[in-house]
Amino acid sequence: SAWVNEGILHESEARTNQMVYSGDLTGPSGWTGQATAGTVTAGSPFGTYQTLSPSASGGNLGPAQRYQIGKSITSGATYVGWSLVKYSAGSGWFVVNMYDTSKQSEQAFFDLQNGVVGSKDTLIIDHGMIDYGDGWWLCWASSNAASTSGGASYEMPNADGVQSCSAADVILIAGTQFEQGATPSSYIPTGSVAATRAAETLTVPAANLPYDSTNMSIQMDGKMTYADSGIASEVEMYRWILNGTNYINSTVQAYSSKTGEPVFSQRDSATALDSVVGSGNTYSPDTNVPFNFAVRHGSTFINAANEGTLLTANTTPTALPNLSSTDLNFGFDFMGTIGQFRMWDED
């Protein structure tokens, strides 16, 4: 498929890939299981890949597994496991199994041949497929830890929801990841030890901002990834804050019926909080959710439009906060790509 410039990949959360030798399932340590992994070969979106196939046909998935377990995890936290895979031969089914010593197996099934999400065990919170082009799929599953030891197993059943396998099945596998979080982040390659990607920040210095005490406009678009954990601010698109009573920001809420609801706010120390709110489920929790909005912040109004829908203006503000000497952070609490961020000192 043709390359498309999606913008800047920005991930405000630090993540650690606990899978060692994440791109080599024959790695000298870490990997266990009877499935047969081939030689590491150049040629995938992550640079290299291997073949993976069951070592024998059977009525259980023992011959069709490669796994790493015994990882230190936090009970009650959410973890996501994933792999970038491609169909090669046979049935084309693939499983991400979120292993936890208190719950044993938690399987999510994927049809690589047809690019279709299959069934999942009850304790899997969510699972999905992200299209990387040319038949490559990032297959992921999330679950809550119930112990302090766990990991992930990558398996090859010969149908949806079954525990049998066929030695004739072959897939290509390019990378694996097991990380704390509700959704998959970008690939963190590892060698003999786990690797961490630091949290990222995007800051515009105050000197470079077109601050105006009367009116300003902001436009932003891109794709975001988030899960519904039931909090008021799942995503914070931008944050321009002097203190708790002087700020401008934009969030996506995800609690009760407000899941996916965009909120555009401003507050001056002399006045109450003023906001304009979009519809619930405007942005449903998922991976790579497109967004596009524009907002007008004024001394006597705040208004916005998102996804082509003009929201009702709020005309109760009496002043804009004085942020003339304050840096602005965009993508403050954000996982995804930012296509554009534009700001100007006009209504």
Residue ranges and their predicted role:
Residues 1-296, 301-302, 306-310, 322-326, ...:
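Extracellular and organelle-lumenal recognition/adhesion modules and their flexible linkers in secreted
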Residues 318-320:
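A short acidic/small-residue loop/turn micro-motif
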